[in-house]
């Protein structure tokens, strides 16, 4: 049970996006971000590994990390923000943690994440 006023909850539910794919920490995603340059707007892709995810309704956010010219870059996106145009899951990662902050200390091949394979059918 949420402790929010029903009116606040109704307004927040109207703001929620419905076209967000299911993704988890460890997944490699491409986030299309709306960038305003002067009077024109364009989409900029930010591709990286999801290292954290916070599910809080309208306040949901996720952190994406990538290596750009040898420097680690992390960006926190608000899941339901109008700035985020599209989220595309490129690769599913198989990890045993919810927060992958340990990847900050690793570099090169040590920072690789195993790919999650589809479940085998028994029988």
Swiss-Prot record:
Molecular function in Gene Ontology: structural constituent of ribosome
One of the Pfam families matching this protein, by short name: Ribosomal_L19
GO terms for cellular component: cytosolic large ribosomal subunit
Keywords from the UniProt entry: Ribonucleoprotein, Ribosomal protein
The keyword 4Fe-4S is assigned to this record: no
InterPro entries documented for this protein: Ribosomal_bL19, Ribosomal_bL19_CS, Ribosomal_bL19_sf, Translation_prot_SH3-like_sf
Keyword Ribosomal protein tagged: yes
GO biological process: translation
Coiled coil: none
Function recorded in the entry: This protein is located at the 30S-50S ribosomal subunit interface and may play a role in the structure and function of the aminoacyl-tRNA binding site.
NCBIfam families, per database record: rplS_bact
Protein name as it appears in the record: Large ribosomal subunit protein bL19
């Amino acid at each position: 049970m949420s402790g929010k006023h029903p009116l606040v909850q109704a307004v927040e539910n109207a703001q929620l996006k419905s076209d967000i794919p299911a993704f988890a920490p460890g997944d490699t995603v491409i986030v299309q971000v709306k960038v305003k340059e002067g009077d024109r707007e364009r989409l900029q892709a930010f591709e990286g590994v999801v290292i954290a995810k916070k599910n809080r309704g309208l306040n949901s956010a996720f952190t994406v990390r990538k290596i750009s010219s040898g420097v680690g870059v992390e960006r926190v996106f608000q899941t339901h923000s109008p700035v985020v145009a599209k989220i595309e899951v490129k690769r599913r990662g198989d990890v045993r943690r919810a927060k992958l902050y340990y990847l900050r200390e690793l570099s090169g091949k040590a920072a690789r994440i195993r790919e999650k394979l589809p479940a085998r059918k028994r029988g």
